[in-house]
Amino acid sequence: MKRLRVGDLVQVISGKEEGKQGRITKILADEDRVVVEGLNTVTRHQRPTPRNQEGGKITKEAPIHASKVMPVDPATGKPTRVKVRVGEDGKKTRVGKSGSAIGVG
């Protein structure tokens, strides 16, 4: 998955969370899915264990298929397609349609 990285700001383009934005916290490359902070939350019932004495209902983020999210262009604030541009020094950078670099650092 060359177009998405941990820490990228993405927007969900289809499904129940459509139009919402969040940062990627985890990438599951073998399943082609990503976990986005604060989106696609599910409630799981946790049984008490020696480590977790309380148990109860736990809310956590579930993975979303990578095809349902698009990186947000920092210049426009809108979802954009990503291409990889190779600089003169051979360094690769991901850029959006506006030409601005996408990514954390």
UniProtKB/Swiss-Prot annotation:
SMART domains: KOW. GO terms for molecular function: rRNA binding; structural constituent of ribosome. GO terms for biological process: translation. It holds the Pfam family ribosomal_L24. Keywords: Ribonucleoprotein, Ribosomal protein, RNA-binding, rRNA-binding. GO terms for cellular component: ribonucleoprotein complex; ribosome. One of two assembly initiator proteins, it binds directly to the 5'-end of the 23S rRNA, where it nucleates assembly of the 50S subunit. Belongs to the universal ribosomal protein uL24 family. HAMAP family: Ribosomal_uL24_B. Part of the 50S ribosomal subunit. This is Large ribosomal subunit protein uL24. The gene is rplX.
